[in-house]
Curated annotation (Swiss-Prot):
HAMAP family: LpxK. SUPFAM superfamilies: P-loop containing nucleoside triphosphate hydrolases. It catalyses: a lipid A disaccharide + ATP = a lipid IVA + ADP + H(+). Coiled coil: none annotated. Pfam families: LpxK (PF02606). It comes from Burkholderia pseudomallei (strain 1710b). It is an enzyme of class 2 (transferase). PANTHER family: TETRAACYLDISACCHARIDE 4'-KINASE, TETRAACYLDISACCHARIDE 4'-KINASE, MITOCHONDRIAL-RELATED. Transfers the gamma-phosphate of ATP to the 4'-position of a tetraacyldisaccharide 1-phosphate intermediate (termed DS-1-P) to form tetraacyldisaccharide 1,4'-bis-phosphate (lipid IVA). GO terms for biological process: lipid A biosynthetic process; lipopolysaccharide core region biosynthetic process. This is Tetraacyldisaccharide 4'-kinase. It comes from the Bacteria.
Amino acid sequence: MSARPGLLARAEARLTREWQRRGALAWALAPFACAFGAIAALRRAAYARGWKARVDCGVPVVVVGNVTVGGTGKTPTVIALVDALRAAGFTPGVVSRGYGAKIAAPTAVTAASPPQQAGDEPLLIARRTLAPVWVCPDRVAAVRALKVAHPEVDVVVSDDGLQHYRLARAVEIVVFDHRLGGNGFLLPAGPLREPLSRRRDATLVNDPYSRALPPWPDTFALSLAPGDAWHLDRPSRRKPLAQFAGERVLAAAGIGAPERFFATLRAAGVAPATRALPDHYAFATNPFVDDHFDAILITEKDAVKLGTSWRDARIWVVPVEAALDPRLIALVVEKLRGRTSA
C-alpha cells in the first residue's frame, strides 16, 4: 500500500491536535485568522443587511451544518432528521454540495448513482432514506432542480451549507462533536469557520464521553449508536459487533473524525488495530491487500465507494444510527409549521 494515505491522515490528525490548544503554531497563524474572520464577517453582514439578496426557493430549508472543520456527525443526523420529518407528515428532500462529486449542474442522486458522480455522503443519504437527493455546488440551483423534479417535496434538508448564505433557510442546526470549538480560533489558527457565538436555531453535541452539554440555548445531545455489521459481498449477512471480539480485526475509516469510529468499536467490545485514512478517501485500489486480519471493519460512508468489483471477504460494514432528542424534532416541526401557516 502506498504510504501517501497514511501520511495525509497523520498530517490531518496532527493539525487537528494543534487546533485543540493555543500553542506556538496557533499564535503564529493568529493574524491570518483575524483576516479570515474579517472576510467572513463581511460576507455575513452583506446578507444580513440586504446588500446581497438571499434566495427563497419556495420551500422551507433546514440546514444541518457546522462551524468547525472536520466530521461531527452531520450525515447520520441528516438521515435521522429526514426520517423524523417523514414521520411527522412531511415529504422531505435533500440537497448537498456533493464533496468530490464531478458535477457542475444540479444532478439527481439515486441508490444506483456512481459515487464519483454523486459524492459519498449524498449517495449514503439516498440509499438510507430513499428521499429525493440532488447535488450541486450551487445549493440554490440544487433546491430549485429538486423542487421541479419533485413538486410533492414540502421541506428540504441541506446536508451542510451553513456558510452558503445566499440560500434562504427556515431552520439552522449546528452540529459539534466532543471537541466543540477547539482552541476557539478561526481558520487557519483553529478549527472554526465562524465564531462560536454565531446565531442558530438549535445545537447538537455528539459527545461519546457523555460530558455536560455547553450552556447554549436550545442545545441537545446527539447519540450515535452502531448496528450489526453487514458483509460487503453479501449484505444480507449480519454479525453483531460483539462476535468480532476474539478475532484479529482492523478498523479503517476515511472520515472526518476516524477516532470516533474506533472508539465506538472499542465500546462495543472490539479491540481492533486501527488505520485512519484521509477524509473522503477514494479507495481507487484495495489498501488492505497486504494486511493479515480475520476481519476489516469500515464505515458506511466508505462502503458506498467500494463497488461490486471488490472481492475481499474480510470486509464488514458498520452502520451508525443517530438518535435525535424529541425536543429537537418538536422545535424543527414547530418552526416549519409556523412558517407554512404564516
